[in-house]
Amino acid sequence: MTEDKTKRSDNIEMRCADASVKCYSYEEALDLTGHGKYNIGLLFACFMVIIAMGIDIFGLGIIVTAATCDLGLNLQQIGILSSMPFAGIIVMSYPWGYLSDTRGRRLVLMWAMTGSFISAVLSSLAPSWQVLAALRFISSALSSAAESATYALLGECCNSRSRARYMLLMTSALMLTPTLYYVWGYFITKLNFSIYIMGILYRPWRLLTLVMALPLGIGAILLWFFNESPKFLANVGRMEEAVDVLRRMHEVNKGKTEIYPVQGIYLEEGSKEEVGQLTLRSLWLQIAPLFKPPLLGRTLLLYYLTFVIYIANNSFAIILPTIFNVFFTSYANLGPNSGSFCDLFYVASETPAPITNTTIIEPVIPECTDTISENTILAGCAHGLSFFVLNALLSQCAGRRKILTIVILVIAAIAAVLINVTGEAISGLVLFYVFLTTAMVFGIVSSYFVTLYPTSYRGMVACIGMMVARLSAFTGTNVVSAAITTTCAPTFYGTAALVISGAVAAWFLPSDSTEIN
């Protein structure tokens, strides 16, 4: 024990060579910066980056649907296009984690969002579906850096009192994205113009693609006004820069009249991560500690929770416009006596309608049209806005993350079981909405990636978590889209069992007061 104290003292001495300078731990120094304009501004910038990523990845369904006529897409080609964002995320999750931990959160975000913006803008001029697919793959691969690096950047610049609440507020950004791209899609595709430019026919779907790319550029510009994470700087040995950033945060938050007392800091774990080249060996050195004691248990637990909530939620959320369209179309045709929620999908499976696992505009369309169904828009907006508000309200309970996770998952599992049991379609739709509240757990799990891991591993563990999430969503989407019209009820029962297992796993999460610096 004495030896440990000596080693700890030596680490502090090494980081504060000047004996006349009082050293503060990073968390103490961060608390002294206060909470104010800098934190709120950074929250807004990161919020915009997350919105941009969500629109870039999840808004592609609207674009693909509107472009079907111009690009002459068949169902197989639509499926390939719709899968491009997930392919991009899966390929780049690992490298982004490494770069975030070794090159810097802000630097990675600025380059990634700028590159994604350029690729997304170019995709609006794609002459063929193959070029569109390639550019959207690049765009999503780059924008996917946002999901891990933004949480790390924001979490390391907020004091312990506001950190968990900010993490949950960040999830609200993803809840807001469907409303944005549904509304943009609705109004822009109502326009009627065709302009030949640079050898292509410029129609509304191309304008929509351009508009949906703008948040990527705006996010990159906003990040320019903020500094790198001071904790990252301290972790790689750039202590003076870290203190300078903390001093600037204090100045922005409290003004120039109050002097910032911190002149030296140290990281409590006394670790220093060397910045190396991006090689397979360096990547392995980053990931290996996550699957060894003492991190192994929490890594497996959090990755299982990630698997459960994403396969349960995104498997349905990604094809949500299709689900809404099938529901409202079948219900309009059959009326109140249409049977249960699942009965509507059984009826739809027997009707020769062009229903696929991507966004559907109209049930039967004799000719090409870019117009988006109003029922799909209204349902999508209601879902996005209500979840945004709900998540913002739940962020006020950030101090009770563990119990919140368990309660949400249990309620969602019960709703999934009852969806078809009620025997009535509208109540089934309401319960389906309740089931989708599993999305509220996204931010909670992300906050655990920040609080339960040392600084040098946070970017990597979050990025691998994102890879687990997207692989789960990709697999689940294909399973659900194939099963919901033939084995709808068993699909929900199986999902309910999976969600319950997630609630049981959440019971083993550490207490909310546990945090690793």
Map each language-model feature to its residues.
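Transmembrane-helix signature of 12-pass secondary carriers
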Residues: 2-236, 241-247, 269-329, 357-358, ...
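Generic structural motif recognizing short loop/turn segments at the entrances and edges of beta-strands
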Residues: 88, 201, 263, 340-341
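Short intracellular "coupling" helices and adjacent cytoplasmic loop segments at the cytosolic face
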Residues: 250-264, 329
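Internal, charge-rich low-complexity segments
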Residues: 315-352
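Sparse recognition of residues in long alpha-helices and their boundaries
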Residues: 83, 170, 257-259, 336-337
